[in-house]
Amino acid sequence: MDWARRVELVSVLVASAVAVAGLWYSNVQAQQALDQARQERALTKEGQITDRYTAAVSNLGADKMDVRLGGVYALERIMQDSPRDHSTIANVLATYIRLHAARPPAQGQDVPADVNAALTVLATRDSSHDGDFRLDLRSAWLSGTEIGRQVPYQPAVLAQADLRGTHLRGTKLGSADLRATNLSNADLRNADLTSTTLSRASLVKTDLRGAKLFAADLRHAFLTEAELSGTDLRSAEMRGARLPRADLSGSNLEDGNLRSADLEGADMSGSNLKGVDFTSASAGVSGANLTGANLTGANLNGADLSTVNKEHHGTPLVGVILDGANLEGANLADADLTGADLSHVKNLTRKQLDSARTDAETRLPAGLS
């Protein structure tokens, strides 16, 4: 290859290298420009959100209801647009509710619309952005509200909330998520809790008289000394629930599941216990008051009936309807069965009877008379 040809090739290579370098530099410049534009847009958006947040919070302090409502809904929109600000806004709305619902509404008045709106926003929020936020509505007066009902088919999310002493009488909470929520000493009289999830919730000394808990999930819930008289607990899932000294008198527990539940000292007098599963409630029914209860078809497999009604009446099972009840493995040691009607129970053995107290008035199944 002659010298001229070599010079030509070198020139081509140099030109190509310069072109590549130029393209690379242009690309770097373009990328830097894009990054800068992106940062500027982010800063602009952040500034806009800050301005929107400031305006919304300012509206919460307005005298007019419609302005305050606008502030609540503006905060909801910011919460949706900026997950980073989610927990801050949730805390603002919770504080707003506690401040504006610290006292009961005037007689004949409902919970204010702005408080109800803030409650709905919190109850229907995307809890995956909660971070360390925990809903705190202690002692708030929220009776009669329809939490989350403004959003069709979206149940309220109140899991792990602190609702101690909250006034929720007549509140509609159907299908709400209240897992591990603290409702101790709360007022839930006549509340609608149909199909609500209350597993591991704390309901210690909670007033649930007349509440609807049909098909509710109360697995391992804590209901010590809870007021449940006249409550609708049909088909409720109460496996492992703790109900010592709870008042269940006159309640309807038909077809409920009370496997391994603790009912020590509970008052179930006059309750409908048809088809209830008491399997393995070995420490459960001890000392409970079943006077006048209907246990037709109930499963008492392995349940401890040895001290049922002892603290309440001298003849524990008189008046208790046991038609078709399954007593397989039930502990009847020293149980007072005098005057009891056991003629239609299932799986009762002579060994169980020999450990209990009976008399001439005790009616036994055929074959055990």
Predicted regions, residues:
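Membrane-proximal alpha-helical anchors
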Residues: 1-98, 351
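Short boundary motifs at domain starts and secondary-structure transition points
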Residues: 45, 126-127
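Surface-exposed acidic, glycine-flexible loop patches that form ligand/cofactor-binding
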Residues: 62, 127-128, 244
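Hydrophobic core/packing positions within alpha-helical solenoid repeats
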Residues: 75, 93, 115, 119-122
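Tandem repeat scaffolds
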Residues: 131-369
